[in-house]
Structures are given as structure tokens and as C-alpha cells.
Amino acid sequence: MAEVRLGENESIESALRRFKKKIQKAGILSEVKRRERYEKPSLRRKRKQEAARKRNR
């Protein structure tokens, strides 16, 4: 889990910016969006195969 500690003279806005960057790098937001709805295993395999094809081009 991403954790950000507020520095002595640090504003909340800058700490929030750092937190958002950490979450983006960790891929937490994209995973949450992906898990919003159930994905059938066959569709999951299909999506992974398409992603692999795009990477190998």
C-alpha cells in the first residue's frame, strides 16, 4: 500500500501530489478500474493475448 508522510513544512497539496504519483507507479488505480466488474476467464485470456500481440509488434 502506498504511504506518504507529511513533512514538517510540506503542504497537503504537495503530499497529495506525491501520493497520487506513488499510486500511479504502483498501478493501484488501473487495477481497481479493471476489477470494477467481473471478467469471464475466457475474456481475460483474450485480453492478455491481445496485449501480448501489441507488445511484440
UniProtKB/Swiss-Prot annotation:
Keyword tRNA processing recorded: no
Q: What's the source species for this entry?
A: Thermosynechococcus vestitus (strain NIES-2133 / IAM M-273 / BP-1)
For the biological process aspect of GO, one term held by this record is: translation
Q: Name one GO molecular function term.
A: structural constituent of ribosome
InterPro entries recorded:
Ribosomal_bS21, Ribosomal_bS21_CS, Ribosomal_bS21_sf
The source's domain of life comes to: Bacteria
Does the keyword section mention Ribonucleoprotein? yes
Q: What protein family does this chain belong to?
A: Belongs to the bacterial ribosomal protein bS21 family.
Entry keywords, A to Z? Ribonucleoprotein, Ribosomal protein
UniProt protein name: Small ribosomal subunit protein bS21
Q: Which GO terms describe its cellular component?
A: ribonucleoprotein complex; ribosome
